Amino acid sequence: MSLARPLLSGVVTCFNEERQIRACLESLAWCDEIVVLDSHSTDRSAEIARSFPNVRFLERTYYGAAAAKNFALDQTRHEWAFILDADERCTPELRAEIEALLAAGPACGAYTVKRRCYFLGRAIRFSGWRNDRVVRLIRRGAARHANARVHPRVVVQGQAPTLRSPLDHYMIEDFHEYLKRMVKYGHWGAAQAWRDGQRASSFADVLFRPAWRFFRTYGLQLGVLDGGVGIAFCLCQAFATYAKWSLLWSWQLDAARGRSPQLPEFDEREETWRGAVPAAE
């Protein structure tokens, strides 16, 4: 018999994740409710999510990872929430640790979780991801995601200790799909940098920053020990850096000619990207 614990909400944000969402939600089936926030997917993500009896399915335009996660957290009904991305899975050992922690009475308002990362079906042990950790177990009001369109930082009131058990992160199983994702992240990263006032000092940034990213992840962070998949993974990270800085440089050239860059849509009322001035009420 499991120990009595406070009620727990699972939280998942997604867009066109029909290949991932079912396994993600199955790993959260033990939660008392699951809030799924979908950014108007055009595949079967909504159909799959709605097939789970404890899922509350919501739709909202995507203004960034921080805005999505904060909004989804605000829709939960219980004191504690456990957040997953669609490409993540809660492992049985992590579930057991979370349930025991909640039953015993948590001493902190948020907890960090280690991630075991997989790329093209292979475990990534190094390549800059060896110590990958994310804040995912949150008491209501104890943490918020600082605004960033990609990979937002979590601002926690107090400490966020790391749990022993990891979650599994299946970053990508299709190489072409991953490259498209890196282009998208590069676009968003460039847009965020532009709003923050960041600019390329010269075209050298377009050349040397990706080269440094590869050297750092493959050499200094021991991506070489991940074998052939490590080379591919580190090259993809370098490509994302190239996409960001090449686009930022092209926008600077356009600005010099009097043309404004076409940035992704931004939620002016509810959220601000890192470095931006909050909109007035």
Descriptions of predicted regions:
Residues R257-E281:
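Alpha-helical transmembrane segments and their immediate juxtamembrane flanks
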Residues R19-R22, D43-S51, E93-L94:
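Acidic helix N-cap motif at the loop->helix transition within catalytic regions
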Residues A66-L73, E79-W80, T91-A255:
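Catalytic-site signature of metal-activated, phosphate-bearing donor transferases
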Residues S27, D38-I48, Y62, D85:
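A conserved acidic beta->alpha catalytic loop
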Residues L7, D32-E33:
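Residues at the starts of beta-strands that form the adenosine-phosphate
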Residues S39, R60, H78, D85-E88, ...:
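Short acidic donor-binding/metal-coordinating loop in glycosyltransferase active sites
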